[in-house]
């Protein structure tokens, strides 16, 4: 099944000159969404993660779907100030400025094997920061998975070289 037709191109969003790749049509279609979960499930079968980590916000949708599909636990990585209790945090560079991500300090008990998921891999900044955060929290990062990858932005190159990185749809 070709998943490209489940992605809608939205020009000039969120600002002029940006072509946004929207997975909303995929989320609305039970057949397309099931195909995504099945394909990511095959990756889970090979990597054998203990937990799925999803990056705010659409990574929550992908991550919870996959965690439920494979009967695994889910850990959210959030923007600052959104998680109660003790957290680990990491600051990372954006095109203009910096941002911060946080994870519960007790989320990685027992050094679990972690698969990080998100809807999109672009420059790799957020995914790379999440990979570092997982390691800081004590997790063993085994892979990253994305629905869409914008290959021309070379985000894959910013991710650790010792993990498996998979994307279901590639745009160049």
From Swiss-Prot:
Top-rank EC class of the record's enzyme: transferase
Part of which pathway? Purine metabolism; AMP biosynthesis via salvage pathway; AMP from adenine: step 1/1
Catalytic activities? AMP + diphosphate = 5-phospho-alpha-D-ribose 1-diphosphate + adenine
Q: Kindly indicate where the leader peptide sits in this chain.
A: none
Superkingdom of source: Bacteria
Q: Name one Pfam family in it.
A: Pribosyltran
Listed A to Z, the keywords are: Cytoplasm, Glycosyltransferase, Purine salvage, Transferase
* Known EC number: 2.4.2.7
- Name the SUPFAM superfamilies on file: PRTase-like (SSF53271)
| One GO cellular component term noted in the UniProt record for this chain | cytoplasm
The entry assigns this protein to a family as follows: Belongs to the purine/pyrimidine phosphoribosyltransferase family.
Q: State the name under which the record lists this protein.
A: Adenine phosphoribosyltransferase
